[in-house]
Amino acid sequence: YLLLLCLPLTLMGTGAVPPGPSIEIHPRIVGGWECDKHSQPWQALLTFTNGLDGVCGGVLVHPQWVLTAAHCIGDNYKIKLGLHDRFSKDDPFQEFQVSASFPHPSYNMRLLKLLLSDELNDTYYDEISLGADFSHDLMMMQLEKPVQLNDAVQVLDLPTQEPQVGSKCHASGWGSMDPYSRNFPRTGKLQCVDLTLMSNNECSRSHIFKITDDMLCAGHIKGRKDTCGGDSGGPLICDGVFQGTTSWGSYPCGKPRTPGVYVKIFSHVDWIREIIATHS
């Protein structure tokens, strides 16, 4: 998730935030369980080369391309694949430098930079809070070389049709398990959480930001289960099909009747394929 309004510019996409209003785009798994080892072989972990670990998730959509959230944009990333326990020295994984990044051209980077700036005042706050549109929160990241596909590292196919409201979904990530934490202590082992796809109309009644046709909403009426700080860019899989990536949500995570918001991948399939075809 993007903890909307709170990420400092130097930690874009990390989920580390100073105190601020409770308008948030965050990333983390709350109310889930430890995924079976390598049951999500397309799951990627974005890390900084300076040692800051676990800033965002991602999805392997091609042997040399990872899809993540545009709000995770930053410099000097490494990407880990085939990882389960990020604290284990015995957990084998593949690690790659990022050779190029391509945020979606329609994502509102100006709004993101404004959100993360030190100049946030009442005027800017109104601009952000009143129907701000964070659609197209996607970024393609090209790896320095293709991955080696095996049982722990696999490409996740793009969807061929939209999901239906009520679909049973699950999300995964190494994000925070504490819905109230603003420092996002992250889990060591990959977590999964089951979610239900909810209607965008219902979702729009729960959030002050704009809910568009290029977004999906997933959660539970009673709350308690959600993605959260650190899970941004990770996959949402509905009825066995890749349908979304974690984008933003409320604070605290897992509030009743307040589903998390995901990018609708079906709306962006052509763009994803175009990036791969043009730059591979």
From Swiss-Prot:
<feature type="disulfide bond">
    <location>
        <begin position="169"/>
        <end position="238"/>
    </location>
</feature>
<dbReference type="Pfam" id="PF00089">
    <property type="entry name" value="Trypsin"/>
</dbReference>
<feature type="active site" description="Charge relay system">
    <location>
        <position position="137"/>
    </location>
</feature>
<dbReference type="GO" id="GO:0031638">
    <property type="term" value="P:zymogen activation"/>
</dbReference>
<feature type="disulfide bond">
    <location>
        <begin position="228"/>
        <end position="253"/>
    </location>
</feature>
<keyword id="KW-1015">Disulfide bond</keyword>
<feature type="active site" description="Charge relay system">
    <location>
        <position position="232"/>
    </location>
</feature>
<comment type="similarity">
    <text>Belongs to the peptidase S1 family. Kallikrein subfamily.</text>
</comment>
<keyword id="KW-0720">Serine protease</keyword>
<dbReference type="GO" id="GO:0004252">
    <property type="term" value="F:serine-type endopeptidase activity"/>
</dbReference>
<feature type="disulfide bond">
    <location>
        <begin position="56"/>
        <end position="72"/>
    </location>
</feature>
<dbReference type="GO" id="GO:0005576">
    <property type="term" value="C:extracellular region"/>
</dbReference>
<feature type="glycosylation site" description="N-linked (GlcNAc...) asparagine">
    <location>
        <position position="121"/>
    </location>
</feature>
<dbReference type="InterPro" id="IPR033116">
    <property type="entry name" value="TRYPSIN_SER"/>
</dbReference>
<feature type="disulfide bond">
    <location>
        <begin position="203"/>
        <end position="217"/>
    </location>
</feature>
<keyword id="KW-0964">Secreted</keyword>
<dbReference type="InterPro" id="IPR043504">
    <property type="entry name" value="Peptidase_S1_PA_chymotrypsin"/>
</dbReference>
<dbReference type="InterPro" id="IPR009003">
    <property type="entry name" value="Peptidase_S1_PA"/>
</dbReference>
<keyword id="KW-0865">Zymogen</keyword>
<feature type="disulfide bond">
    <location>
        <begin position="35"/>
        <end position="192"/>
    </location>
</feature>
<feature type="glycosylation site" description="O-linked (GalNAc...) serine">
    <location>
        <position position="99"/>
    </location>
</feature>
<keyword id="KW-0732">Signal</keyword>
<dbReference type="GO" id="GO:0003073">
    <property type="term" value="P:regulation of systemic arterial blood pressure"/>
</dbReference>
<keyword id="KW-0378">Hydrolase</keyword>
<dbReference type="InterPro" id="IPR001254">
    <property type="entry name" value="Trypsin_dom"/>
</dbReference>
<feature type="signal peptide">
    <location>
        <begin position="1"/>
        <end position="16"/>
    </location>
</feature>
<dbReference type="InterPro" id="IPR018114">
    <property type="entry name" value="TRYPSIN_HIS"/>
</dbReference>
<comment type="function">
    <text>A kallikrein-like protease. It preferentially converts human high-molecular-weight kininogen (HK) to bradykinin. Displays broad substrate specificity in vitro, with highest activity toward Boc-Val-Leu-Lys-MCA, Boc-Glu-Lys-Lys-MCA, Boc-Glu(OBzl)-Ala-Arg-MCA, Boc-Val-Pro-Arg-MCA, ZPhe-Arg-MCA and Pro-Phe-Arg-MCA. Has preference for Arg and Lys in position P1 and hydrophobic residues in position P2. Is not toxic to mice.</text>
</comment>
<dbReference type="InterPro" id="IPR001314">
    <property type="entry name" value="Peptidase_S1A"/>
</dbReference>
<keyword id="KW-0645">Protease</keyword>
<feature type="domain" description="Peptidase S1">
    <location>
        <begin position="29"/>
        <end position="277"/>
    </location>
</feature>
<feature type="active site" description="Charge relay system">
    <location>
        <position position="71"/>
    </location>
</feature>
<protein>
    <recommendedName>
        <fullName>Blarinasin-1</fullName>
        <ecNumber>3.4.21.-</ecNumber>
    </recommendedName>
</protein>
<keyword id="KW-0325">Glycoprotein</keyword>
<dbReference type="GO" id="GO:0030141">
    <property type="term" value="C:secretory granule"/>
</dbReference>
<feature type="propeptide">
    <location>
        <begin position="17"/>
        <end position="28"/>
    </location>
</feature>
